Curated annotation (Swiss-Prot):
Cofactors demanded by this protein: Zn(2+); Mg(2+); Co(2+)
The protein's Enzyme Commission number: 1.1.1.262
Function: Catalyzes the NAD(P)-dependent oxidation of 4-(phosphooxy)-L-threonine (HTP) into 2-amino-3-oxo-4-(phosphooxy)butyric acid which spontaneously decarboxylates to form 3-amino-2-oxopropyl phosphate (AHAP).
Name of the gene this protein is made from: pdxA
Protein name per Swiss-Prot or TrEMBL: 4-hydroxythreonine-4-phosphate dehydrogenase
SUPFAM superfamilies: Isocitrate/Isopropylmalate dehydrogenase-like
This protein's UniProt keywords: Cobalt, Cytoplasm, Magnesium, Metal-binding, NAD, NADP, Oxidoreductase, Pyridoxine biosynthesis, Zinc
Catalytic activities: 4-(phosphooxy)-L-threonine + NAD(+) = 3-amino-2-oxopropyl phosphate + CO2 + NADH
GO cellular component: cytoplasm
Residues that, per the record, bind a divalent metal cation: H175, H220, H275
Stored InterPro entries: PdxA, PdxA_fam
Note: The active site is located at the dimer interface.
UniProt binding sites for substrate: H140, T141, K283, N292, R301
Length: 342
């Protein structure tokens, strides 16, 4: 299935003062040198033009819709306009532009759910800036889950995956303090995270029989209870349940021996118990080409595995590889899924 048959990837602008505009321009400008799926930038065309001028780039920009984006992509950077209400200064975020950030997300999600765009890719946002403007969600992912639930009437449990050429890793708990992880690791949360991950690996990643390796929480996976009870009392019963339901699952495994080359050959995804247990190996093995994928949503969502990098904005030094990887993976998952919805 070609990109023309499934529509462009809808790419949100992210925080306009960050590097989102810079890396978007770089990806498009280098499209002739490497495979780049057609995308539709949902954001401020004037911002893109100003950033291109600041960076010394000549980038033609055209305002268009989804079908027009695919047709125009080789000649111009297609934009679905969402205007920023306040002037944008690279590196200086302004809460006055928070409404444009969320409007771009809302618009892109609507386009994907309507089947006009094939998938969603999101440039980085600043939670601190959005909080200043009254944003009430813990982060980007939770906001997307709320939009999906309101659109479909079905609550979604979003699951975070870092996907790179050498490793896919999923943290069960995400942005919580390490001291709170043991209490947050409930059997239901571990089970749902694993089943959602397996379902998306089948339907979107083209893996009919995914292999899951589940990490323990404690050193040496608890060492029979000597170093903690969670591995045997909480994690192991979930693994037994998953196996009984036919999933290919191993664990709980000591995390310090899960990520070397030979170990990674034995599984398709590592299910980790907390944020750094998953993201440290994922980023160490593929910092520039790892992609943040949100599983469990009724649409495909990817993003680069970095933040707004305000200190780099407008300087021509931000690297675009992770965004390109996010766009490529979004298009690949859409082709695998045969459309946009679960």
């Amino acid at each position: 299935m070609s990109e023309t048959s499934i529509g462009p990837v809808a790419l949100t602008m992210g925080d306009p003062a960050g590097i989102g505009p810079d890396i978007t321009l770089s990806v498009w400008a280098k499209r002739a040198d490497r495979p780049t799926p057609p995308f539709l930038y949902v954001g401020d065309p004037a911002l893109l033009a100003a950033r291109a001028k600041l960076l010394g780039q000549t980038v033609p920009i055209c305002e268009t819709d989804c079908p027009g984006a695919v047709a125009a992509f080789r000649q111009a950077l297609p934009v679905w306009p969402v205007r920023s209400p306040a002037p944008v200064i690279p590196g200086n975020p302004d809460a006055a532009n928070a409404s444009a950030v969320t409007d771009a997300i809302d618009t892109a999600v609507r386009l994907v759910l309507a089947g006009e765009a094939s998938a969603l890719a999101t440039n980085p946002i600043s939670k601190a800036v959005l909080y200043e403007a009254g944003f009430r969600f813990p982060g980007h992912t939770e906001y997307l889950a709320d939009l999906a639930a309101r659109a479909t009437g079905v609550a979604a449990l979003p699951v975070m995956m870092l996907a790179g050429p050498k490793l896919r890793a999923v943290p069960v708990t995400i942005h919580i303090p390490l001291k709170d992880v043991p209490a947050a690791l409930t059997p239901d949360l571990i089970y749902e995270t694993c089943t959602i991950t397996a379902a998306d690996l089948r339907s979107r990643f083209g893996l009919p029989a995914p292999r899951l390796a589940i990490a323990g929480l404690n050193p040496h996976a608890g060492e029979g209870g000597a170093l903690g009870r969670e591995d045997d009392a909480v994690i192991r019963p979930v693994i037994d349940r998953l196996r009984a339901e036919g999933l290919d699952v191993v664990g709980p495994l000591p995390a310090d021996t899960m990520f070397h080359d030979r170990a990674r050959e034995t599984y398709d995804v590592a299910i980790c118990m907390y944020h750094d247990q998953a993201l440290i190996p994922a980023k160490a093995l593929g910092f520039d080409d790892s992609v943040n994928v949100t599983l469990g949503l009724p649409f495909i969502r990817t993003s680069p595995d970095h933040g707004t990098a305000f200190s780099l904005a407008g300087k021509g030094i931000a690297r675009e590889e992770s965004l390109l990887a996010a766009l490529r993976l979004a298009a690949e998952l859409a082709r695998n899924a045969g459309g946009t919805k679960r």
